[in-house]
From Swiss-Prot:
The gene is floA. InterPro entries: FloA, SerRS_1_N_sf, tRNA-bd_arm. Homooligomerizes. The keyword Membrane applies. The chain crosses the membrane at residues 3-23, 26-46. GO terms for molecular function: nucleotide binding. This is Flotillin-like protein FloA. Found in functional membrane microdomains (FMM) that may be equivalent to eukaryotic membrane rafts. FMMs are highly dynamic and increase in number as cells age. Flotillins are thought to be important factors in membrane fluidity. It comes from Sorangium cellulosum (strain So ce56) (Polyangium cellulosum (strain So ce56)). It comes from the Bacteria. Belongs to the flotillin-like FloA family. Keywords: Cell membrane, Membrane, Transmembrane, Transmembrane helix.
């Protein structure tokens, strides 16, 4: 029984030692004390209980102290970690800003980091400006010639406007808009080719970095190419459209004329039918006149001679408009 008791006590002591070593990272505590970071044993145990990795917080605190950032406390680092921030990136950004002589405190750096910005990259861009290139921008001068331009924009991160400021895409879009506006206001495309710096000057005057997280230092036109003659194409397309409209109107007038012609032909046939109908009553009228004595025989033959003479004259003139003898049908 005594042996079993000794084994149980030894096991409990071993478990207690392992738990103590887990709860109290001696290596980190020793490193913090050696570097003057001033992290107590209770603080390390509290980090374990709050599920905060002590090594990340302690290493960041040691880096800050060694860089002279004594104001960055363990509580500030731990609070930033619990807010899902990147502690190491914030501390490295503070160190870089301090070495570069920039004014950047922990609260602002933490706010930039929590806003989703890369605070370390922002500090690096503030020290070393970066060049971003626009895609090929197409614009048309007043003479109708298309120009394709590529601009290189040198920007520097503005720490004060990183939170809530627009990003690179906004800067590129504004620069492209300025390039299009400048080329579009040029009377001659040759003037733009001869003086590409006019584009840079006009674009810089517009203050395109307002409301963005960057400060535009310079805009340089890297390349300008001549595209197609857009003005001529538009005129050609307009002429073709006018031609089609004119053809449509002419076709409409032709169809209207054909319809009117057919209508007149129908009316002519109708009048001829009425004429034939009227002429069919002439023999009956002549017979009735002869029977009643209102028309003499000599008068009838005189009328026949006139009709025959008229038909002969029309035949000689080439106009066969003569009608058959209406009296002969009776």
């Amino acid at each position: 029984m005594e042996i079993i008791s000794v084994i149980v006590i030894g096991g409990l002591v071993l478990v207690a030692i392992v738990a103590t070593l887990y709860m109290v990272p001696l290596r980190l505590w020793i490193a913090a004390q050696a570097s003057g970071a001033g992290v107590s044993m209770l603080t390390l145990i509290a980090m374990r209980l709050r599920r905060v990795p002590p090594d990340q917080i302690v290493n960041a605190r040691i880096s800050a102290v060694k860089a002279g950032l004594e104001e960055v406390s363990v509580d500030m680092l731990e609070a930033h970690y619990l807010a899902r921030g990147r502690v190491e990136a914030v501390v490295n950004a503070l160190i870089s800003a301090g070495k570069a002589g920039m004014e950047l405190d922990f609260s602002r750096a933490a706010a930039i980091d929590l806003a989703g910005r890369n605070v370390l990259e922002a500090v690096a861009m503030s020290v070393n400006p970066r060049v971003i290139e626009t895609p090929k921008v197409s614009a048309v001068a007043k003479d109708g010639i298309q120009l394709l331009a590529i601009a290189r924009v040198t920007v520097r991160a503005n720490i004060d406007r990183l939170v809530g400021g627009a990003g690179e895409q906004t800067v590129l879009a504004r620069v492209g808009e300025g390039v299009v506006s400048t080329i579009g206001s040029a009377d001659d495309y040759k003037h733009v080719l001869e003086n590409p710096d006019t584009i840079s000057k006009n674009v810089l005057k517009k203050g395109l970095d307002a409301g963005t997280a960057f400060e535009i230092l310079s805009i340089d036109i890297a390349d300008v190419d001549v595209g197609s003659n857009i003005g001529a194409k538009l005129q050609t397309e307009q002429a073709e459209a006018d031609k089609q409209v004119a053809q449509a109107k002419a076709e409409s007038r032709r169809a209207l004329a054909v319809a009117q012609e057919q209508e007149m032909k129908a009316k002519t046939q109708e009048m001829r039918a009425k004429l034939v109908e009227a002429e069919s009553t002439i023999p009956l009228a002549v017979a009735e006149a002869l029977r009643t004595g209102k028309l003499g025989v000599m008068d009838y033959y005189n009328m026949r001679n006139v009709i025959a003479d008229t038909e002969m004259r029309q035949g000689i003139a080439g106009t066969t408009g003569g009608k058959p003898d209406p009296a002969g049908e009776s």
